[in-house]
From Swiss-Prot:
Similarity section: Belongs to the VPS26 family.
Protein name (record): Vacuolar protein sorting-associated protein 26A
Keywords in alphabetical order: Cytoplasm, Endosome, Membrane, Phosphoprotein, Protein transport, Transport
Cellular component GO terms held in the UniProt record: cytosol; early endosome; endosome; endosome membrane; lysosome; retromer complex; retromer, cargo-selective complex; tubular endosome
Native organism taxonomy: Eukaryota, Metazoa, Chordata, Craniata, Vertebrata
PANTHER family in alphabetical order: VACUOLAR PROTEIN SORTING 26 RELATED
Biological processes annotated in GO: endocytic recycling; intracellular protein transport; regulation of macroautophagy; retrograde transport, endosome to Golgi
Induction trigger: Down-regulated in Alzheimer disease. No polymorphism or variant is however associated with Alzheimer disease for VPS26A.
Subunit and interaction comment: Component of the heterotrimeric retromer cargo-selective complex (CSC), also described as vacuolar protein sorting subcomplex (VPS), formed by VPS26 (VPS26A or VPS26B), VPS29 and VPS35. The CSC has a highly elongated structure with VPS26 and VPS29 binding independently at opposite distal ends of VPS35 as central platform. The CSC is believed to associate with variable sorting nexins to form functionally distinct retromer complex variants.
Phosphoserine sites (modified residues): S315
Keyword match Protein transport: yes
Region span, Disordered: 306-327
Composition bias, Polar residues: 316-327
Protein transport listed as a keyword: yes
Length: 327
């Protein structure tokens, strides 16, 4: 499959074709404006190779240049400071020395076993992207073609995946015990748990479980946190009684979350929390947040072929928001 470029002037069109484009899997990513883009999918350590085709549209014309190159770029862009993009990967291959083009040409390129340390990501305030960039250097205006790729980071975890179990409450009014079966979930996993009411002296009208995503960008005083409720699961509608136990089952596959991303290049983090919310008859809201880790599980076929995918996270701490009264 070809990546068709636009016209850079009336003379030349730049086109990039990957060597394994006919067999390589593609992945989708939602952009900041809500549109869905589809690009070829790569993993950490995979090589990227193909051809750069320069097609002349007007035979007989000449294109003078100061050199032709292709780059593999990994870049982080903060939307509130678009002038300050940070490249954490930049590999360059020179395709041609200074000269002139008088006819269509093709150039082979290969970036061997490219390190791709982070997952592609587009959020509310930040974008992490990988792309190929072809530049025809000219005296006045360079001709440039950028071509996006998508990178997924695959994680493996040991068999030990502790459950989360806590007792919370309001003194002499409400005392509940909640339990989630794991603390780390892959993106297609099911969150299974239960809520057990030990003491109920206030009238609970409604109870739900929320999956909350927090995107933290910047450092120090310039830190910005964007909070989004990814999923809501109604646990009960009505008053519980002492001794009642209510099951929880939340399917993550229906919500398309990203993996947890911790301190990516000291620029941003993406963290996920389970938020247990209770609403009483006076519409007061009580809650308890617990951080969980989301990770991308390697497909079975890929797990058998490759054993070098491993991504570790620090043990998360439970964190509660100050926006609402905590149980």
């Amino acid at each position: 499959m070809s990546f068709l470029g636009g016209f850079f002037g009336p003379i030349c069109e730049i086109d990039i074709v990957l060597n394994d484009g006919e067999t390589r899997k593609m992945a989708e990513m939602k952009t900041e404006d809500g549109k869905v883009e589809k690009h070829y999918l790569f993993y950490d350590g995979e090589s990227v190779s193909g051809k750069v085709n320069l097609a002349f549209k007007q035979p007989g014309k000449r294109l003078e240049h100061q050199g032709i190159r292709i780059e593999f770029v990994g870049q982080i862009e903060l939307f509130n400071d678009k002038s300050n993009t940070h490249e954490f990967v930049n590999l360059v291959k020179e395709l041609a020395l200074p000269g002139e083009l008088t006819q269509s040409r093709s150039y082979d390129f290969e970036f061997m076993q490219v390190e791709k340390p982070y997952e592609s990501y587009i959020g509310a305030n930040v974008r992490l992207r990988y792309f190929l960039k072809v530049t025809i250097v000219r005296r006045l205006t360079d001709l440039v073609k950028e071509y996006d790729l998508i990178v997924h980071q695959l994680a493996t975890y040991p068999d030990v995946n502790n459950s989360i179990k806590m007792e919370v409450g309001i003194e002499d009014c409400l005392h509940i015990e909640f339990e989630y079966n794991k603390s780390k979930y892959h993106l297609k996993d099911v969150i299974v748990g239960k809520i057990y009411f030990l003491l109920v002296r206030i009238k609970i009208q409604h109870m739900e479980l929320q999956l909350i995503k927090k995107e933290i960008t910047g450092i120090g005083p310039s830190t910005t946190t964007e909070t989004e409720t990814i999923a809501k699961y109604e646990i009960m509608d009505g008053a519980p009684v002492k001794g009642e136990s209510i099951p929880i089952r939340l399917f993550l596959a229906g919500y398309d979350p990203t993996p947890t991303m911790r301190d990516v290049n000291k620029k941003f983090s993406v963290r996920y929390f389970l938020n247990l919310v209770l609403v009483d008859e006076e519409d007061r809201r009580y809650f308890k947040q617990q951080e969980i880790i989301l990770w991308r599980k390697a497909p079975e076929k890929l797990r058998k072929q490759r054993t070098n995918f491993h991504q570790r996270f620090e043990s998360p701490e439970s964190q509660a928001s100050a926006e609402q009264p905590e149980m």
